[in-house]
C-alpha cells in the first residue's frame, strides 16, 4: 500500500493520516474545462469511499475522531460544487470563513463615491462626496443528521467480524449504507445551499410591480412629499393590476413581455463590489445578473420570447473574495488565509500531490494575484434589453422529490368585488339597440331587463356560469345582528348636538281639548316645534350626490338601513308633555319598520318606480278609463262638498248606506253624467259598499266598472303579500304575512276609522307588543254601540267611541266587529296605497263638525206632493226639490244645486232616517307599539312607533278653494295624521292663522305631535315625497308602495329574499380567492456576499446507535446601495379556490344576542341555514362554530366564501368598475398625512372627501362610517369570532389595526426607497431587506392597497356571454342590466377573463 502524508493547510484542521488504494491515490487530470468541477467531485467521492473500504481498527474512539474529521472536511469541500454550477452563483461572492462559528456579530463598512456633473454658469463648484455605509452580517446555518446503527458500528470497527464470508459481506453492506447516508447528507447540503441563497435573495427582493415605479420616481426625484407619494401609489396600483401575471394575459404579446422584463432587470441597483470572480459567456462578456424562475416560465420564455445568445457560461471554480483591491488582503486579514481556488482545495484538503494535480497548458502563477480558475458549464444566457442574463430554473434540479416547496411557486390571494341589486341612474339605463336582447315570443310582461336586477352572473374556475342572487344574502341580513345598534347609539351620544327642530322627533299626548282647538293650537304654535327646516325634509330633497357629499351635515346619522338616528330632547319619556322640556339634546334611534322609509336619495324614486312596474307587469292593472276617472276626481277642486256631507252622514255605517242608497245612486250618476268622474272614491267603505250593492245595473256600466276595477285592484295588491311570503306555520299566534308586511299587521290602524273594528283586531294581535293607545287624551277607549239624536253631544270630549249600529238586530247587544279582519286589511291598503297613488299627496285628513253636518243635511226643502200626482221629472218642474223656488239659503238643496247634482225628493227624504245612527265628533287616536317578534331584540325592545288615526274623520281630496263653506271651516277642519295626508292647501280652512305660522307650516307636513312624529311613524317622509315626485302612473305607484311596506326585520327580509322580492337594499359582494403563481426573481451580479464556515460534526447516543449531526455556520451581507434584486409573479398556474358562490352565514360563525322570542329565533336560525353548503350537521353553539363544516367532496377546489355588505340601491355603479374599497371609502396610511390622527380621519371623518373620490364622502354610508351596520358586522374590534381572517374576507378592510398595519408597510417601503441614495453616517447601519409586509404586494395586494378588484360579472347572462365570445365593442349596459369588466390582476389570464 502506498501512503500519502501531505501536511494540511494552515487554516484547516489537522487531518489524520490515511491510506489510499492504488487505483485512487492519484487524482484525475484537472483541466480548466467543463470537467473541472465534476472531476473534483468524483475524486472527493472516491477518496471518501476508499477510506471506508480500507479502514480497520478496533478502537471506536479512533474511528470516531477520524470519521468526524473526514466527514466534516468532505462536506465542507463539496457543498458548493452544485451551487457553483447554478445561475444563483452569479448573484453571490462566496468567501470561506473557517472562524465564522466564533464570530458573535460582524459589520462591514463600505465607501461610496457619489458621481458629479461639472456644469457651466454661476453654479458653485461641486466637491467630491464620499458616503460611508455600514452593514451587518446576518448569521445563518445549515444542519443535517443521520444515524449509524450499533450493529453497523460493530461491523465497521470489525468488532463483530467472525472471519466468515457472510460477516465480510455484511461489513461491506454496512460501509455501503454509510456511504449512501453520507452522500445523502452531502446532497442535502448542496440543495440546502441553493435553497438558502434563493431565500436570501428573496428576502431582499421587493416585488417588481412596486420597484419599477419606485425606481422611475426615484430617478425623476418624485419621492418626497404627500402629493408625490399619492402619485406613486396610483402608479403602483396600476402596475400591479396590469403587469402581474404578464405571461398569461391574452393581450400581452412578445414585445409586451420583453418590455416588462426589461423594466424588471433595469429597476435594480448595481452593487458596490466589482469582483473579478464572476460569470461570463463563452466570448468573455460578463453576465449582468440572473433571472431565476420555474420550469414552466423558463420553457415559455425560451419558446419564442427571449433569444438564447449562448448555451455555455464560464463560472469561477473558487471561493471568492469580498472586496478586491489588487490583492486578497482584506479577506486574508479579516477571515484568515484565503483559499483562492480549487488548486488549494486539492492541495490542502484532498492531499493530492502538486505534481499530479493538473496537466495544464498555462503556467501556474503563484502569489496572491493568481488568475482565478474557471470552468465551462452548460447555461442559457439571454439578452433582456442591453443586459446579459443567466436564465435559471432549479425547480426540478434541486427541489424535485424533496418535501420542500420551491420558493418561486407561491400563492396569491385576491379579493374580488361584485355589485348585486344596484339600480343604475336614469342616464345610464340605455340600450344601443332595443332589439339586441329582445324578449322571447309569448312573453306578455315586456322586457324584464328594464326591472331592477336581482342576480349577478359570473364564471367559476372551470368556466361554468354561476350566479349569486338576493336570496343568498339571507345568511347576512336575516340574523339578530341586524338589530344590534346599542353600541352605535352609545357612540353617537358622545357627540354634542343642538336641538333646533323637534318637529318629527317628539310625540305628545292629545290635549284635553276639542280636536279642532287642539289642532289649531298646534298650527298657531308651530314655531316652538319648527325653528329650523327639519332634517328629514332636507334629506328628501337631496340628490344622491348631495346626500353622499361632505357638505351633508346629516350624513353621520345615516348608519343603518333599518334604523333612523336623530336628535331628541334628552331623558324625556314619550309621549311627553305638550310643552317641549328645555333639556340637553341627545340621540335616539327608531326602527324604520319598512323599506319605504329608507331615505329617498339612498332608495330613489327611479328604483321604486321600476319595482312597481315589475310587479304591475304580472298582476292586475286598472284600466285607463278607471285611472282617468279616479285621477280626475282626486284633482277636482270643484268636487261637491255635498258628497263629503253625505259621506259624513253615512260615517261608514252599512245600515246608513242602505238607507241613503237612493241618494247615493243619484249622486254618483249625476256626477258621472256631468264630468265622467266618480264620487266617494276617497272613502274605502263607500267604494266597498258601492261595489257590493250598486254594481248590478243601478249605475251606468262604465261607472260601475270603475268601482269594480278599484276593488279588484285592492284585492290584487293584497295578493302581493301572499305571493311574497313563504307559507309556513304561524309564530306565537302571528301569521308570517303579518310579520312580513306592515299593512297586514293588526297593530297598524287605518288613518280613518268609522267603527271600532280595527281597534278590536288590534287588541287581538298585540301579544307582547306593549300597546300604547290614547283616545281623546285618555288611555284606551270606551265603546258606545250607536248614537241617536236625543243622546248626541257634539262638544263631547273623552275616549268614548261610537261603534255604529249593526244591521242585524241580533248583534245589537254584543260588541263584535261589523266586518271580518280582511275588511280592515283592505281598508289600510286602500288608504295607504290606493289613495296616495291617485292623490300624489294632494289630500288631507279632516276633522268633521257634525253639528253643522247634521244641521245642513236635515235642512232639506221638499215640496209636498199629492198621492195621485206624478213625481217631477227634473229640476225644471217647480215641484222638484232642486227647482229655483225651493233653493233656500243654507239648505242642502242649494249645495246639491250648486254642484249640478240632480236628486229627487225621495232620495232627500232618506236623510231623515239617519238620526237613529249618528256620529257626534272626530276623535284623535294616538297608538304605539314595540316591534313584533320578528324584530324584537335587546336593542329594539323599547323602541316604539307612534301613529295617529281619526275616528269619524274624513279624507278630503283636492282642496275646494272655491267653496266658501270649506274655506271657512264650517264643516271640516284639517287634522293631518301623517305625511301622506298632509296637504298644505287644506290649511286654508284654518282661519286667522298668524302669517309667520302659516309660512312655517309650509316647511314640513303639518302633522301635530299628538298624532305622531316622522321618526316614530310607521309611514315617514320618504314615502310621502316619493308619491309626489314619481313619474309613473297609479298602477305602478300602487305596486311600488305595496312593495315599500314590506318590513325591515330579519324574519320579514327572509320572506322577501327567499321569494325574490327586491328589499330596497343592494349588496356589495366580497370574495377572496387563492391562486398558484410562478414567480420570477432577478438579482444583480455579485449582489450578496456569502460566507461559509467550517462544518462541525457532533455525535450523541441514539436509540440503537449513534447520531451524527452536521452543522455549517454561514453568513451573508448585502452588497448594494439600493435594492439589488426584485421578484414578481410572472405566470398564473391555476386557481386553488373554486371562485364560486358559497355564501357566508352569520348563524354559523357569529355569536350575537338572539331575538327575544325563542320561537322566532329558532325559526330564523333554522330557515337561514337550510341548504347552506357549509352548514353544520349539528346544533350551532350560541357563540357560533369554531370552524365551518366541510362537504364530503369537492369538485372545483376549496370553497371561497362570499360575504355581503348592504349597500344603497342608488350607489354609484361606476365605483365598482375600477378597484375600490368595499367599505365605499378609501382607507389606509398611504392616503393620509403625517399626523397621528390622519389615518383614523381618512377612514371615518366624512367631513373630508374620500381620497379616491374627493367629490363625495362615501359611496356606502352604511359601511364606511364608524359603528355603521357593516362596520359593526365585519370590524374585528367588535367581534371575536365572526369577523376574523379565518371566516371573513372583509375583515382586512374594516378592522382599523389591520388597515393601518398593512398600509404602513407600503408607506415604509416607499420611505426607505426614497432615502436609498441619501448619505449615511459611518456609525449607521443600512440593510436593504424586503420590508415587513411587502410580501403582501404579491401575495395579498388587496390588503396592502385596501382595494378589491372588479371581476367579470353581469346581471344578465346575455351580456356576459356576448362579452365572453370576444365580439368587439361589447356593451356594458342594456337598460337596467349591467356588465362589469374584469379590472383585476388576473384579467386576461384565465379563459373566463
From Swiss-Prot:
The keyword Protein biosynthesis does not apply. It comes from the Viruses. GO terms for molecular function: structural molecule activity. InterPro entries: Herpes_MCP, Herpes_MCP_upper_sf. The keyword Transcription regulation does not apply. It is found in: Virion; Host nucleus. Pfam families: Herpes_MCP. Its main location: virion. GO terms for cellular component: host cell nucleus; T=16 icosahedral viral capsid. Signal peptide: none annotated. Keywords: Capsid protein, Host nucleus, T=16 icosahedral capsid protein, Virion. SUPFAM superfamilies: Major capsid protein VP5 (SSF103417). Self-assembles to form an icosahedral capsid with a T=16 symmetry, about 200 nm in diameter, and consisting of 150 hexons and 12 pentons (total of 162 capsomers). Hexons form the edges and faces of the capsid and are each composed of six MCP molecules. In contrast, one penton is found at each of the 12 vertices. Eleven of the pentons are MCP pentamers, while the last vertex is occupied by the portal complex. Homomultimer. Makes the hexons and eleven out of twelve pentons. Interacts with triplex proteins 1/TRX1 and 2/TRX2; adjacent capsomers are linked together in groups of three by triplexes, heterotrimeric complexes composed of one molecule of TRX1 and two molecules of TRX2. Interacts with scaffold protein; this interaction allows efficient MCP transport to the host nucleus. Interacts with capsid vertex component 2/CVC2. Interacts with the small capsomere-interacting protein/SCP. Belongs to the herpesviridae major capsid protein family. This is Major capsid protein. It comes from Gallid herpesvirus 2 (strain Chicken/Md5/ATCC VR-987).
Amino acid at each position: 500500500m502506498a501512503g500519502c502524508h501531505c501536511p494540511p493547510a494552515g487554516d484547516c484542521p489537522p487531518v489524520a493520516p490515511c491510506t489510499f488504494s492504488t487505483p485512487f491515490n492519484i487524482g484525475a487530470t484537472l483541466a480548466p474545462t467543463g470537467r473541472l468541477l465534476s472531476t473534483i467531485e468524483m475524486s472527493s467521492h472516491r477518496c471518501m469511499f476508499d477510506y471506508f473500504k480500507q479502514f480497520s481498527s478496533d478502537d471506536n474512539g479512533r474511528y470516531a475522531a477520524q470519521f468526524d474529521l473526514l466527514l466534516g472536511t468532505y462536506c465542507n469541500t463539496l457543498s458548493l460544487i452544485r451551487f457553483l454550477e447554478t445561475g444563483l452563483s452569479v448573484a453571490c461572492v462566496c468567501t470561506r470563513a473557517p472562524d465564522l462559528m466564533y464570530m458573535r456579530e460582524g459589520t462591514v463598512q463600505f465607501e461610496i463615491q457619489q458621481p458629479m456633473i461639472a456644469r457651466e454658469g454661476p453654479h458653485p463648484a461641486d466637491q467630491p462626496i464620499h458616503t460611508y455605509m455600514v452593514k451587518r452580517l446576518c448569521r445563518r446555518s445549515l444542519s443535517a443528521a443521520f444515524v449509524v446503527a450499533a450493529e453497523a458500528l460493530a461491523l465497521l470497527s470489525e468488532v463483530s467480524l467472525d472471519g466468515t464470508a457472510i460477516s465480510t459481506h455484511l461489513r461491506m453492506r454496512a460501509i455501503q449504507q454509510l456511504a449512501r447516508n453520507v452522500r445523502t447528507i452531502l446532497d442535502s447540503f448542496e440543495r440546502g445551499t441553493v435553497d438558502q441563497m434563493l431565500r436570501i435573495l428573496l428576502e431582499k427582493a421587493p416585488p417588481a410591480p412596486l420597484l419599477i415605479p419606485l425606481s422611475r420616481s426615484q430617478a425623476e426625484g418624485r419621492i418626497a412629499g404627500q402629493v408625490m407619494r399619492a402619485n406613486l401609489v396610483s402608479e403602483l396600483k396600476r402596475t400591479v393590476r396590469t403587469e402581474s401575471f404578464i405571461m398569461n394575459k391574452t393581450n400581452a404579446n412578445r414585445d409586451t413581455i420583453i418590455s416588462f422584463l426589461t423594466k424588471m432587470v433595469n429597476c435594480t441597483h448595481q452593487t458596490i463590489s466589482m469582483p473579478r470572480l464572476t460569470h461570463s459567456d463563452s466570448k468573455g462578456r460578463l453576465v449582468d445578473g440572473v433571472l431565476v424562475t420555474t420550469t414552466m416560465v423558463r420553457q415559455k420564455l425560451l419558446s419564442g420570447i427571449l433569444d438564447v445568445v449562448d448555451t455555455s457560461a464560464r463560472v469561477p471554480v473558487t471561493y471568492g473574495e469580498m472586496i478586491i483591491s489588487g490583492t486578497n488582503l482584506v479577506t486574508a486579514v479579516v477571515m484568515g488565509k484565503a483559499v483562492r481556488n480549487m488548486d488549494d482545495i486539492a492541495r490542502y484538503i484532498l492531499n493530492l500531490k502538486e505534481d499530479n494535480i493538473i496537466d495544464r497548458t498555462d503556467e501556474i502563477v503563484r502569489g496572491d494575484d493568481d488568475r482565478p480558475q474557471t470552468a465551462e458549464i452548460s447555461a442559457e444566457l439571454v439578452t433582456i434589453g442591453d443586459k446579459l442574463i443567466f436564465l435559471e430554473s432549479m425547480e426540478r434540479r434541486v427541489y424535485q422529490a424533496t418535501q420542500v416547496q420551491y420558493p418561486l411557486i407561491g400563492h396569491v390571494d385576491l379579493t374580488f368585488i361584485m355589485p348585486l341589486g344596484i339600480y343604475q341612474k336614469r342616464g345610464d339605463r340605455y340600450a344601443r339597440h332595443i332589439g339586441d336582447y329582445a324578449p322571447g315570443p309569448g312573453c306578455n310582461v315586456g322586457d324584464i331587463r328594464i326591472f331592477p336586477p336581482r342576480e349577478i352572473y359570473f364564471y367559476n374556475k372551470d368556466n361554468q356560469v354561476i350566479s349569486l342572487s338576493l336570496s343568498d344574502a339571507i345568511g347576512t341580513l336575516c340574523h339578530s345582528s341586524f338589530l344590534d345598534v346599542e353600541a352605535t347609539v352609545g357612540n353617537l351620544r358622545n357627540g354634542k348636538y343642538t336641538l333646533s327642530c323637534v318637529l318629527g322627533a317628539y310625540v305628545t299626548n292629545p290635549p284635553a281639548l276639542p280636536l279642532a282647538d287642539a289642532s289649531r293650537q298646534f298650527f298657531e304654535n308651530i314655531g316652538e316645534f319648527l325653528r329650523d327646516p327639519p332634517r328629514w325634509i332636507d334629506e328628501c330633497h337631496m340628490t344622491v350626490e348631495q346626500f353622499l357629499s361632505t357638505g351633508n351635515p346629516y350624513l353621520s346619522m345615516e348608519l343603518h338601513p333599518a334604523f333612523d338616528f336623530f336628535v331628541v330632547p334628552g331623558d324625556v319619556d314619550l309621549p311627553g308633555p305638550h310643552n317641549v322640556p328645555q333639556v340637553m339634546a341627545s340621540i335616539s334611534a327608531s326602527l324604520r319598520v319598512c323599506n319605504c322609509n329608507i331615505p329617498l336619495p339612498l332608495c330613489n324614486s327611479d328604483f321604486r318606480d321600476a319595482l312597481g312596474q315589475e310587479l304591475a307587469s304580472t298582476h292586475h292593472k286598472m284600466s285607463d278609463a278607471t285611472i282617468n276617472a279616479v285621477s280626475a276626481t282626486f284633482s277636482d277642486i270643484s268636487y261637491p262638498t255635498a258628497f263629503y256631507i253625505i259621506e259624513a252622514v253615512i260615517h261608514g255605517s252599512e245600515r246608513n248606506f242602505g238607507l241613503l242608497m237612493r241618494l247615493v245612486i243619484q249622486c254618483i250618476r249625476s256626477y258621472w253624467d256631468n264630468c265622467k268622474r266618480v264620487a266617494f272614491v276617497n272613502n274605502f267603505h263607500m267604494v266597498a259598499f258601492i261595489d257590493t250593492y250598486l254594481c248590478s245595473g243601478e249605475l251606468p256600466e262604465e261607472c260601475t266598472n270603475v268601482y269594480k276595477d278599484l276593488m279588484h285592484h285592492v284585492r290584487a295588491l293584497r295578493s302581493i303579500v301572499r305571493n311574497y311570503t313563504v307559507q309556513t306555520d304561524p309564530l306565537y299566534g302571528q301569521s308570517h304575512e303579518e310579520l312580513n308586511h306592515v299593512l297586514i299587521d293588526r297593530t297598524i290602524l287605518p288613518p280613518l276609522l268609522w267603527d271600532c273594528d280595527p281597534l278590536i283586531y288590534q287588541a287581538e294581535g298585540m301579544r307582547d307588543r306593549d300597546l300604547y293607545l290614547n283616545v281623546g287624551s285618555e288611555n284606551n277607549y270606551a265603546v258606545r254601540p250607536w248614537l241617536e239624536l236625543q243622546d248626541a253631544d257634539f262638544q263631547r270630549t273623552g275616549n268614548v267611541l261610537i261603534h255604529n249600529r249593526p244591521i242585524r238586530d241580533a248583534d245589537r247587544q254584543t260588541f263584535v266587529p261589523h266586518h271580518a279582519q280582511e275588511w280592515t286589511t283592505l281598508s289600510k291598503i286602500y288608504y295607504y296605497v290606493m289613495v296616495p297613488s291617485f292623490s300624489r299627496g294632494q289630500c288631507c285628513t279632516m276633522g268633521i263638525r257634525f253639528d253643522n253636518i247634521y244641521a245642513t243635511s236635515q235642512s232639506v226643502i221638499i215640496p209636498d206632493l199629492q198621492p195621485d200626482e206624478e213625481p217631477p221629472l227634473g229640476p225644471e218642474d217647480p215641484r222638484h226639490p232642486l227647482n229655483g223656488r225651493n233653493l233656500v239659503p243654507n239648505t242642502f238643496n242649494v249645495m246639491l244645486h250648486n254642484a249640478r247634482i240632480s236628486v229627487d225628493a225621495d232620495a232627500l227624504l232618506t236623510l231623515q232616517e239617519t238620526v237613529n245612527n249618528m256620529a257626534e265628533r272626530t276623535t284623535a287616536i294616538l297608538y304605539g307599539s314595540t316591534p313584533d317578534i320578528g324584530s324584537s331584540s335587546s336593542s329594539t325592545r323599547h323602541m316604539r312607533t307612534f301613529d295617529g288615526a281619526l275616528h269619524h274623520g274624513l279624507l278630503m281630496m283636492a282642496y275646494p278653494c272655491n267653496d266658501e263653506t270649506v274655506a271657512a271651516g264650517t264643516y271640516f277642519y284639517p287634522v293631518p295624521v301623517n305625511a301622506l295626508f298632509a296637504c298644505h292647501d287644506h290649511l286654508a280652512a284654518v282661519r286667522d292663522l298668524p302669517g309667520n305660522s302659516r309660512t312655517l307650516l309650509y316647511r314640513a307636513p303639518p302633522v301635530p305631535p299628538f298624532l305622531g312624529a316622522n321618526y316614530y311613524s310607521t309611514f315617514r317622509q320618504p314615502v310621502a315625497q316619493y308619491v309626489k315626485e314619481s313619474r309613473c302612473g297609479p298602477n305602478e305607484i300602487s305596486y311600488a308602495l305595496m312593495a315599500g311596506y314590506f318590513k325591515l326585520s330579519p324574519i320579514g327580509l327572509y320572506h322577501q329574499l327567499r321569494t325574490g322580492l327586491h328589499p330596497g337594499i343592494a349588496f356589495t359582494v366580497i370574495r377572496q380567492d387563492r391562486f398558484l403563481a410562478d414567480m420570477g426573481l432577478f438579482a444583480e451580479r455579485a449582489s450578496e456576499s456569502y460566507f461559509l464556515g467550517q462544518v462541525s460534526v457532533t455525535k450523541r447516543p441514539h436509540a440503537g446507535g449513534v447520531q451524527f449531526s452536521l452543522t455549517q455556520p454561514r453568513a451573508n451581507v448585502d452588497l448594494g446601495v439600493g435594492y439589488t434584486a426584485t421578484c414578481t409573479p410572472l405566470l398564473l398556474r391555476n386557481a386553488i379556490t373554486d371562485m364560486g358562490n358559497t355564501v357566508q352565514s352569520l348563524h354559523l360563525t357569529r355569536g350575537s344576542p338572539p331575538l327575544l322570542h325563542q320561537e322566532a329565533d329558532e325559526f330564523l336560525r333554522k330557515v337561514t341555514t337550510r341548504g347552506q353548503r357549509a352548514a353544520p350537521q349539528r346544533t350551532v353553539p350560541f357563540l357560533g362554530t369554531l370552524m365551518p363544516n366541510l362537504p364530503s367532496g369537492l369538485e372545483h377546489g376549496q370553497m371561497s366564501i362570499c360575504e355581503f355588505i348592504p349597500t344603497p340601491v342608488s350607489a354609484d355603479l361606476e365605483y365598482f368598475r375600477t378597484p375600490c374599497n368595499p367599505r365605499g371609502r378609501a382607507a389606509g396610511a398611504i392616503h393620509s398625512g403625517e399626523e397621528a390622527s390622519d389615518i383614523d380621519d381618512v377612514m371615518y371623518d366624512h367631513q373630508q372627501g374620500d381620497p379616491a373620490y374627493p367629490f363625495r364622502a362615501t359611496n356606502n354610508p352604511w359601511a364606511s362610517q364608524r359603528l355603521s351596520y357593516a362596520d359593526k358586522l365585519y370590524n374585528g374590534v367588535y367581534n371575536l369570532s365572526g369577523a376574523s381572517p379565518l371566516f371573513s374576507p372583509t375583515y382586512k378592510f374594516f378592522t382599523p389595526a389591520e388597515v393601518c398595519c398593512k398600509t404602513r408597510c407600503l408607506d415604509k417601503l416607499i420611505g426607505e426607497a426614497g432615502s436609498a441614495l441619501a448619505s449615511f453616517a459611518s456609525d449607521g447601519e443600512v440593510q436593504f431587506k424586503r420590508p415587513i409586509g411587502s410580501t403582501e404586494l404579491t401575495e395579498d395586494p388587496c390588503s396592502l392597497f385596501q382595494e378589491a378588484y372588479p371581476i367579470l360579472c353581469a346581471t344578465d347572462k346575455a351580456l356576459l356571454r356576448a362579452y365572453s365570445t370576444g365580439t368587439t365593442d361589447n356593451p356594458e349596459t342594456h337598460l337596467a342590466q349591467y356588465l362589469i369588466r374584469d379590472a383585476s390582476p388576473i384579467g386576461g389570464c384565465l379563459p373566463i377573463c
